[in-house]
A protein has these predicted regions:
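Unchanged
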Residues: 1-137
């Protein structure tokens, strides 16, 4: 299942190294510099950028139903947590909860969100191909 992330511009090139994830499974881009696309425009931008990089020969209509994808909007201004705006909200560290299983000291918001999103998509009907989520919820 592919993961598509909209990130702050400075994080796009280094995200795979920081999180130690495969480029073939994770696509990252940012909104055009100086533009405020909003969630709808950002979703369209992210999907089209991913299609152009991974399957430039296919139309968007052909490409969308090929596989399931999790799309996370993780950029933005982060007005509530400005200290995490440069690194992206999904990389915000989350403290370990006492007595909780499966937690690790290096956990961040993304590592806590992703298992649920993957479970949702695995149980979703085959006709549903994209889960769109906000990276800070």
């Amino acid at each position: 299942m592919k993961k598509l992330l909209s990130l702050p511009p400075n994080l796009v090139e280094c995200f795979h190294d920081v999180e130690k994830v495969e480029r073939s499974e994770w696509f990252c881009t940012s909104d055009p510099v100086g533009s405020k696309l909003g969630s709808g425009g950002g979703t369209a931008w992210l999907l089209d950028a991913c299609r152009k990089e991974w399957s430039p020969e296919a139309s968007l209509h052909e490409w969308l139903p090929r596989e399931k994808r999790i799309l996370l909007h993780a950029g933005g201004q982060s007005r509530r947590l400005p200290g995490y705006a440069p690194s992206g909200k999904v990389l915000t560290p989350v403290p370990v909860f006492r007595w909780a299983r499966g937690q690790r000291l290096s956990q961040n918001l993304l590592s806590l969100q992703l298992p649920l999103y993957e479970q949702i998509m695995e149980k979703a009907p085959d006709s549903l191909h994209i889960l769109i989520a906000s990276g800070d919820v």
